[in-house]
Amino acid sequence: MSRTNFDTLLEAGCHFGHLKRKWNPSMAPYIFMERNGIHIIDLHKTVAKVDEAADALKQIAKSGKKVLFVATKKQAKQVVAEKAASVNMPYVIERWPGGMLTNFPTIRKAVKKMATIDKLTNDGTYSNLSKREVLQISRQRAKLEKNLGSIADLTRLPSALFVIDVLKENIAVREANRLGIPVFAIVDTNSDPSNVDFVIPANDDATKSVEVILDACCGAIAEGLEERKAEKVDMEAAGENAPKGAGKKKNTKARMDKAEEEAINAAKAAAFLKEDEEA
């Protein structure tokens, strides 16, 4: 059964492309006709491509991997944030940080810095700092949250990218191509689909168009996550019924002395302040 249909896509305006003079010839296979100087996308092909992409996304989610959603254009930001968050997937809607994929370890350091600042807040280290120092660290935390907060749970490279408007997000697409990360994308008639692995030909400028396609794709991701959860429950049940081992592993992790931990936290706070002054 198809995850969407012609009428739903038509009502959402998914068929409206760009002006003929702005078209990319590589999108010719997905164009149905021209009307009043505007290209009309073949929605029958869009339905098929949505199903194809959704099936692949379901398998990625079922395997426990992450899909990174990218949409920095105004019309798509809010809906992408809502849909991606609903299936616990990371997303970028503010500005694509250069090297987000190709220099991922550096991005992870910035994300870890947020966690460290949160720890300083919770363990009382802030009480030993001046108001000015607290303000500096808080501003640094807010800046990191704005740009990287939505990818805080991304501990490794994503297994796929889902892009809204490959023309605008060309840097993200190039980075994914360079690393061999599959790219799923809503591609309008003015864009080049050649660097996209799963092309969904549709209007990428209308919020409603983006929303109906994300509904289908995120619905598939949700199914994959549910199936993974069910498989885990079955495996745990099977493990409980199996013969238990003789001994249990002991937790040998050493605990840090409180005074030493406070000293380290104070040093980290000082490091944040130094970075802020140098910046």
Curated annotation (Swiss-Prot):
Keyword line: Ribonucleoprotein, Ribosomal protein
GO cellular component, one term: cytosolic small ribosomal subunit
SUPFAM superfamilies (alphabetical): Ribosomal protein S2 (SSF52313)
Gene Ontology terms, MF aspect: structural constituent of ribosome
GO terms classed as biological process: translation
Top-level lineage group: Bacteria
UniProt-listed InterPro entries: Ribosomal_uS2, Ribosomal_uS2_bac/mit/plastid, Ribosomal_uS2_CS, Ribosomal_uS2_flav_dom_sf
UniProt-annotated stretches for the region Disordered: 232-260
Pfam families reported for this sequence: Ribosomal_S2 (PF00318)
The family this protein is said to belong to: Belongs to the universal ribosomal protein uS2 family.
PANTHER family for the chain: 30S RIBOSOMAL PROTEIN S2 PROKARYOTIC AND ORGANELLAR, SMALL RIBOSOMAL SUBUNIT PROTEIN US2M
Descriptive protein name: Small ribosomal subunit protein uS2
Name of the gene: rpsB
